[in-house]
Amino acid sequence: MRDPVEFYNSALVPMVVEQSSRGERAFDIYSRLLRERIIFLTGPVEDYSASLIVAQLLFLEAENPKKEISFYINSPGGVVTSGLSIYDTMQFIRCPVATLCVGQAASMGSLLLAAGEPGHRFALPNARIMVHQPSGGFQGQATDILIHAREIEALKRRLNEIYVKHTGRDYDTIELGLERDNFMTADAAREWGLIDEVLQKRAEASPAA
């Protein structure tokens, strides 16, 4: 059964009607923006939303492997493995991916923000960015709990290494910074190396990014 909140939210997605020589055609707003090579991540990162993002990235690469993709992020984070599937696809495809935080980029959202093309990672002035270490819970036999604890520790190390790669900070600094929930303004995120620039106004020569 479909989640009633999801159904309600989907019913609120605006439609865009375009006129052409072949008549009218209606698109939901996100599909229309996809034609402009704009992808949105809104809400939690989980398997379904990650699959949609990955599919859009692969589609846009197939259309034009050299043209930039604009990836807008407003997310509280979510499932680590789902986020890593998006991250790996961003690094895998040939298109440069510009990232822009609107609202918030927390947890896995901040990692995806930092993973954009160097020099093309942005946030709007009132965006909030948050980094922290992965969390999880497990119940079961003591041996299984230890197995899951080792897995979370391995994920923590891997996420730290990714932040090191994209921020230019050393591992110890990253590990300390992610020890607890670490909230930042857009300017602080720039100083931290998560983004390259805080955008006040869109450049006239840049219609999408």
From Swiss-Prot:
Catalytic activity, as annotated: Hydrolysis of proteins to small peptides in the presence of ATP and magnesium. alpha-casein is the usual test substrate. In the absence of ATP, only oligopeptides shorter than five residues are hydrolyzed (such as succinyl-Leu-Tyr-|-NHMec, and Leu-Tyr-Leu-|-Tyr-Trp, in which cleavage of the -Tyr-|-Leu- and -Tyr-|-Trp bonds also occurs)
Places the protein is found: Cytoplasm
UniProt-listed GO biological process terms: protein quality control for misfolded or incompletely synthesized proteins
Alphabetical list of InterPro entries matching this protein: ClpP, ClpP/crotonase-like_dom_sf, ClpP/TepA, ClpP_His_AS, ClpP_Ser_AS
GO cellular component: cytoplasm; endopeptidase Clp complex
Gene Ontology MF terms in the entry: ATP-dependent peptidase activity; ATPase binding; serine-type endopeptidase activity
Keywords carried by this UniProt record: Cytoplasm, Hydrolase, Protease, Serine protease
Enzyme type, top EC level: hydrolase
Active-site positions on this chain: 107, 132
The keyword Protease belongs to this UniProt entry's keyword annotation: yes
Entry keyword Protein transport: no
Pfam families: CLP_protease
Protein EC: 3.4.21.92
SUPFAM superfamilies: ClpP/crotonase
Main subcellular localisation: cytoplasm
Family: Belongs to the peptidase S14 family.
Self-association and partners: Fourteen ClpP subunits assemble into 2 heptameric rings which stack back to back to give a disk-like structure with a central cavity, resembling the structure of eukaryotic proteasomes.
Role according to the record: Cleaves peptides in various proteins in a process that requires ATP hydrolysis. Has a chymotrypsin-like activity. Plays a major role in the degradation of misfolded proteins.
Name the UniProt record assigns to this protein: ATP-dependent Clp protease proteolytic subunit
